[in-house]
UniProtKB/Swiss-Prot annotation:
Gene3D superfamilies: IlvD/EDD C-terminal domain-like. Mg(2+) binds at D78, D120, K121, E444. Pathway: Amino-acid biosynthesis; L-isoleucine biosynthesis; L-isoleucine from 2-oxobutanoate: step 3/4; Amino-acid biosynthesis; L-valine biosynthesis; L-valine from pyruvate: step 3/4. Its cofactor is [2Fe-2S] cluster; Mg(2+). The keyword Iron-sulfur applies. Keywords: 2Fe-2S, Amino-acid biosynthesis, Branched-chain amino acid biosynthesis, Iron, Iron-sulfur, Lyase, Magnesium, Metal-binding. This is Dihydroxy-acid dehydratase. SUPFAM superfamilies: IlvD/EDD N-terminal domain-like, LeuD/IlvD-like. The gene is ilvD. The active site is at S470 (proton acceptor). The keyword Amino-acid biosynthesis applies. Belongs to the IlvD/Edd family.
């Protein structure tokens, strides 16, 4: 066993002494040592209950003959970090999470690992570490939050973000907003819609690195605790059979993940996270692959923010197994892939009798919400290397649109203009110098997009940025424009009043300025250099790659 490097032989007597200092017996030290990576904290609503999940995991490990050893991981709440300097640090935390787990699991050579994340960057960060370490491992997340609301109807966190604009517009009172803030997020769990955290937890299940139900079983249920116990027991079986993450995550698993992502209408952040995750296994996932899969995969679900359903509804309708079963009927999922159950996907679906239980929540592949997937990749003179839009959440009026550029060099300037009533129908808000390097950190633009929706402009105004978006964003929100402005991208050449052509069906995003004029602008163009006081962010800006390749560190 891997842990024998730390526990076995004459020379390791001092090591055993330190383990005894933890209260471990000789018998416990001789058993397989299982690292339990727990991202619990008292800051993030999606992580506040993870100690309960960890205790269940450890009980499962002990029941199956192992010795669990828990250690922590950081986690950022993107909702709390939104619209201030804290958001610069969210995406960089993904790499720090992966690196810190590599440090812990190498310095202390565990035989197996159980990963317990829940929210936005903790899930991809842990998946990256899982594939990097490639020892028997399993993931079990904390589960989704239930939707909130009152007798008047359901709400979630995005309802509150958009309500800010409604109050500014005069459509809602502060008293009504205060009531919504107290009811929209009713308890622990990852925010209730198909936002980034829940999308990535569904992806972990789809990849075969988590047990069925991981993406959708609500956080507050006993079923979630039982799932955690099963995960603890299952990792011991994976160890016995030497089933490692890289034996599960193959090119076929990559294709499955992207297909399910498109069927779900998942967060655009998957276009950053999945390439980074699969890259740890030596697998390439390009923007062209995303678009190729999207063009042939039907969009079966419209969960919040694209629709009124939530993750709890997806779970009741059959969950990820039902979505995969429906895609399998059309030959869009390869069911021969291995999973952490120790069985193939086909065997799992058969055991679960996977099927759609509510065709309103999970549409038939014969009658989807749309014939194409939730995400589209756009290219053109404004984004030669690509840009990303959640087309399943775009109003029909904005699918093809020529708009007038309103140019801002930061999120804060743009948000102030929206809230100040300075944005008009037909405008395309350009927010630049918010990319991975230029931000630095590629902040999410949820506050501006929510303000657009709240101000009643969702069907009339586009937002185009080299930054990124929350999974809760809806509307004509086009992000990840590459190359970014800080790297000399054409988004840096846009001027106030320029015309922008958005053509999502044709996959085009063009700056309607002739080549001669663009060349003249480029001759005098000097990218804006923002002052960066944080040493971490300065290092990040030097190391990070383009959003078009997952905003990973340079290898």
């Amino acid at each position: 066993m891997r842990s024998k490097k730390m526990t076995h032989g004459l020379e390791k007597a001092p090591h055993r002494s330190l383990l005894h200092a933890l209260g471990l017996t000789r018998e416990e030290i001789e058993r397989p040592l299982v690292g339990v990576v727990n991202a619990a904290n008292e800051v993030v609503p999606g992580h506040v209950h993870l100690h309960t999940i960890a205790e269940a995991v450890k009980a499962g490990v002990r029941a199956a003959g192992g010795t669990p050893m828990e250690f922590p991981a950081i986690a950022v709440c993107d909702g709390l970090a939104m619209n201030h300097e804290g958001m610069h640090f969210s995406l960089p935390s993904r790499e720090i999470i992966a690196d810190s787990i590599e440090i812990m699991a190498t310095a202390h050579p565990f035989d197996a690992l159980v990963f317990i994340p829940n929210c936005d960057k903790s899930v991809p960060g842990m998946l990256m570490a899982m594939l990097r370490m490639d020892i028997p491992s399993i993931m079990v997340s904390g589960g989704p939050m239930l939707a909130g609301g009152t007798l008047a109807g359901r709400t979630d966190l995005i309802s509150v973000f958009e309500a800010v604009g409604r109050v500014q517009r005069g459509d809602m009172t502060m008293a009504e907003l205060d009531e919504m803030t107290e009811t929209a997020c009713p308890g622990c769990g990852s925010c209730a819609g198909m936002f980034t955290a829940n999308t990535m937890n569904c992806m972990a299940e789809t990849m075969g690195l988590a047990l069925p139900g991981n993406g959708t079983i609500p956080a507050v249920t006993a079923a979630r605790v039982r799932l955690a116990k099963h995960a603890g027991m299952k990792v011991m079986e994976l160890l016995e059979k030497n089933i490692t993450p890289r034996s599960i995550v193959t090119p076929r698993a990559v294709a499955n993940a992207v297909a399910v992502d498109m069927a779900l209408g998942g967060s655009t952040n998957t276009v950053l996270h999945l390439p980074a995750v699969f890259g740890e296994a030596g697998l390439d996932l390009t923007l062209d692959i995303f678009d190729e899969v999207s063009r042939k995969t039907p969009n079966l679900c419209k969960l919040s923010p694209a629709g009124h359903h939530h993750i709890q509804d997806l779970h009741a309708a059959g969950g990820i197994p039902a979505v995969m079963a429906e895609l399998t009927r059309k030959g869009l999922v390869d069911t021969s892939v291995m999973t952490v159950t120790g069985k193939t996907l086909a065997e799992n679906l058969a055991e679960l009798n996977a099927r759609v239980l509510n065709p309103d929540v999970i549409r038939s592949a014969d009658a989807p919400y749309s014939a194409q997937g939730g995400i589209a990749i756009l290219k053109g003179s404004l984004a030669p290397q690509g840009a990303v839009v959640k087309q399943s959440a775009v109003a029909p009026e904005m699918m093809v649109r020529e708009a007038v550029a309103r140019v801002f060099d930061s999120e804060g300037e743009a948000h102030a203009a929206i809230m100040g009533g300075k944005i008009n129908k037909g405008d395309a808000i350009i927010i630049r110098y918010e990319g991975p390097r230029g931000g630095p950190g590629m902040r999410e633009m949820l506050s501006p997009t929510a303000a657009i929706a709240g101000m009643g402009l969702g069907a009339d105004v586009a937002l185009i940025t080299d930054g990124r978006f929350s999974g809760g964003t809806r509307g004509a929100a086009i992000g990840h424009v590459s190359p970014e402005a800080a790297d000399g991208g054409n988004i840096g050449l846009v001027r106030e009043g320029d015309h922008i052509l958005i053509d999502i069906p044709a996959r085009r995003l063009d700056l309607l300025v002739d080549e001669a004029e663009l060349a003249a602008r480029r001759e005098t163009f000097v990218p804006l250099e923002k002052p960066v006081t944080s040493p971490l962010l300065r290092r990040y800006a030097r190391q990070v790659t383009s959003a078009a390749t997952g905003a990973m560190y340079r290898k």
